[in-house]
């Protein structure tokens, strides 16, 4: 299951968990973001040991800016509040490989 984050404090509390957190930074107007969304949802079901969240960069621009997001979609992997990997672009194979490698 993918949870859409609603504010900065929620984002920080989730990414500080002692497990893999996969963040999808997206925009509603972004075609590639829409194209990969079903795969991201599928990964959340397949890799249930990780937490999957989405951040709308237009609604939560301060989170995106603080994280260093420059293009959408961007997928950041966190553990214990530290960003451990970054995938830019709608590349499901690369995203899945990164999830597997960091679980």
Curated annotation (Swiss-Prot):
Domain of life: Eukaryota
Active site feature: 30 (nucleophile), 33 (nucleophile)
Species assigned in the record: Schizosaccharomyces pombe (strain 972 / ATCC 24843) (Fission yeast)
Assigned protein family: Belongs to the thioredoxin family.
GO biological process: cell redox homeostasis; cellular detoxification of hydrogen peroxide; cellular response to reactive oxygen species; hydrogen peroxide catabolic process; L-methionine salvage from methionine sulphoxide; sulfate assimilation, phosphoadenylyl sulfate reduction by phosphoadenylyl-sulfate reductase (thioredoxin)
InterPro entries tied to this protein: Thioredoxin, Thioredoxin-like_sf, Thioredoxin_CS, Thioredoxin_domain
Function: Participates in various redox reactions through the reversible oxidation of its active center dithiol to a disulfide and catalyzes dithiol-disulfide exchange reactions.
CDD domains, per database record: TRX_family
Keyword Hydrolase: no
Residues annotated as site: Contributes to redox potential value: 31-32
A GO MF term: antioxidant activity
Keyword presence, Lyase: no
Residues annotated as domain Thioredoxin: 2-103
SUPFAM superfamilies for this protein: Thioredoxin-like (SSF52833)
Protein name: Thioredoxin-1
GO cellular component terms listed in the entry, alphabetical order: cytoplasm; cytosol; nucleus
Pfam families: Thioredoxin (PF00085)
NCBIfam families per the UniProt record, alphabetical: thioredoxin
UniProtKB keywords: Disulfide bond, Electron transport, Redox-active center, Transport
Annotated positions for site Deprotonates C-terminal active site Cys: 24
Coiled-coil segments on the chain, per record: none
């Amino acid at each position: 299951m993918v949870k859409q984050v609603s504010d900065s404090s929620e984002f920080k509390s989730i990414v500080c968990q002692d497990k893999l957190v996969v963040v999808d930074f997206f925009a509603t107007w972004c075609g590639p973001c829409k194209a990969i969304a079903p795969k991201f949802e599928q990964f959340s079901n397949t890799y249930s040991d990780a937490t999957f969240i989405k951040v709308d960069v237009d609604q939560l621009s301060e989170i995106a800016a603080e994280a260093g997001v420059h293009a959408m979609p961007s997928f950041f992997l966190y553990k214990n509040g530290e960003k451990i990997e970054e995938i830019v672009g709608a590349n499901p194979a690369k995203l899945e490989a990164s999830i597997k490698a960091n679980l």
